[in-house]
From Swiss-Prot:
Single GO MF descriptor: GTPase activity
Residue spans of biased composition, Acidic residues class: 432-447
Quaternary structure, from the entry: Dimer of alpha and beta chains. A typical microtubule is a hollow water-filled tube with an outer diameter of 25 nm and an inner diameter of 15 nM. Alpha-beta heterodimers associate head-to-tail to form protofilaments running lengthwise along the microtubule wall with the beta-tubulin subunit facing the microtubule plus end conferring a structural polarity. Microtubules usually have 13 protofilaments but different protofilament numbers can be found in some organisms and specialized cells.
GO terms (BP aspect): microtubule-based process
Identification of the protein by name: Tubulin beta chain
Binding site for GTP: 11, 69, 138, 142-144, 204, 226
Organism taxonomic ancestry: Eukaryota, Fungi, Dikarya, Ascomycota, Pezizomycotina
């Protein structure tokens, strides 16, 4: 069956990854040590997308855990699902990358990368028909960003025809851990544009907003944020892991979502999101789910899609959902919001259904959107990058690891190109021969 090999790099990647494995182990009826004690055959049917079967009814994740310092790994190992992972699949250095992209990409990370690739190769050889790789990492740090992108390009060389999906945590405007985030993120985006097939953009600030506004948590922890991310990751891969009426896999998702190869940065959302106390006051229905996933407040990237237009989007519904109802709701959304969908891609919403809901819910839905408003995210990082780069602030940390200023300039211009490509398609109309008219103006009045 169509297996996926999962990599998690850096502290952020490992923590999101751990939450993801916890979520899908629960969905497949595995306990903390990987022993199956589920209730339904459906849980077993496609277990091998993410798990290898070992002896004694034990299942082992196809996960490779990478970090340049041992701390995070120890935390994962000591966590509730620490016994799940194969001990050989922990690959870690001792030095740490110190939030320095150059260390992760060129010096420290480059020394460790062959070791990681050996493990990846071994996992890939254990697959019948490998579908692709998914990697969780953040773009603001050193290991996840620098070494993560190095791994992506190396895996790309070795498995050119396999899908590469990344779940990338973008630096957010208000929640910043390090000063050099804009540098690290710009250098990473420069790599992702070239080497990834689909990048799901997640951003801490948007996750905080969801926790505070929708889930009514007063001081959300990283655990709460990671739980949200793992819900989306589980949703995106549902169709691979359970039989459904209308299935989708990484490649189908990419074919439907990526109109131009460089524009593969998606916004994601999840529904139902309700605060713990309000569960009993709401019925989860298809219209309710559809309204929630198209609500800007539920997007896990801090950019408002009302400032742009959707090129394409995909909605994945789980649970006992009627096909017709989904179609009607989606058509309804498109008719009401025609201004937010480009008219030169008709039927640009793809739907997928899976009959098995996540634990504890009757139905749920996951949203993936390719919207031109994602450019706000890149613009924001780009402005911060330019401000520092103009003064050459902090550059010596990077040049000291053997980087060249040229690389920074290239990365900056590549990201600016990406922004202008998004802008160009946002303004494009069906009849390109006509004069370009400014479509942004009428949207202001609607708010």
């Amino acid at each position: 069956m169509r297996e996926i090999v999962h990599l998690q790099t850096g502290q952020c990647g490992n923590q999101i990854g751990a939450a993801f494995w916890q979520t899908i182990s629960g969905e497949h009826g595995l306990d903390g040590s990987g022993v199956y004690n589920g209730t339904s055959d459906l849980q077993l049917e496609r277990m091998n997308v993410y798990f290898n079967e070992a002896s004694g009814n034990k299942y082992v994740p196809r996960a490779v855990l990478v970090d340049l310092e041992p701390g995070t790994m120890d935390a994962v190992r000591a966590g509730p699902f620490g016994q799940l992972f194969r001990p050989d699949n922990f690959v870690f250095g001792q030095s740490g990358a110190g939030n320095n992209w150059a260390k992760g990409h060129y010096t420290e990370g480059a020394e460790l990368v062959d070791q990681v690739l050996d493990v990846v190769r071994r996992e890939a050889e254990g697959c019948d028909c490998l579908q692709g790789f998914q990697i969780t990492h953040s773009l603001g740090g050193g290991t996840g960003a620098g070494m993560g992108t190095l791994l992506i390009s190396k895996i790309r060389e070795e498995f050119p025809d396999r899908m590469m999906a990344t779940f990338s945590v973008m630096p957010s405007p208000k929640v910043s851990d390090t000063v050099v985030e804009p540098y690290n993120a710009t250098l990473s985006v420069h790599q992702l544009v070239e080497n990834s097939d689909e990048t799901f953009c997640i951003d801490n600030e948007a996750l905080y907003d969801i926790c505070m506004r929708t889930l009514k948590l007063n001081n959300p922890s990283y655990g709460d944020l990671n739980h949200l991310v793992s819900a989306v990751m589980s949703g995106v891969t549902t169709c691979l892991r359970f039989p459904g009426q209308l299935n989708s896999d990484l490649r189908k998702l990419a074919v439907n979502m990526v109109p131009f190869p460089r524009l593969h940065f998606f916004m994601v959302g999840f529904a139902p999101l309700t605060s713990r106390g309000a569960h009993s006051f709401r019925a989860v229905t298809v219209p309710e789910l559809t309204q929630q996933i198209f609500d800007p407040k539920n997007m896990m990237a801090a950019s408002d899609f009302r400032n742009g237009r959707y090129l394409t989007c995909s909605a994945i519904y789980r649970g006992k959902v009627s096909m017709k109802e989904v179609e009607d709701q989606i058509r309804n959304v498109q008719n009401k919001n025609t201004a937010y969908f480009v008219e030169w891609i008709p039927n640009n919403v793809q739907t997928a259904l899976c009959s098995i809901p996540p634990r504890g819910l009757k139905m749920s839905s996951t949203f993936v959107g390719n919207s031109t408003s994602i450019q706000e995210l890149f613009k924001r990082v780009g402005d911060q990058f330019t401000a520092m780069f103009r003064r050459k602030a902090f550059l010596h940390w990077y040049t000291g690891e053997g980087m060249d200023e040229m690389e920074f300039t290239e990365a900056e211009s590549n990201m600016n190109d990406l922004v202008s490509e998004y802008q160009q398609y946002q303004e494009a109309s069906v009849s390109e021969g006509e004069e370009e008219y400014d479509e942004e103006a009428p949207l202001e009045g609607e708010e």
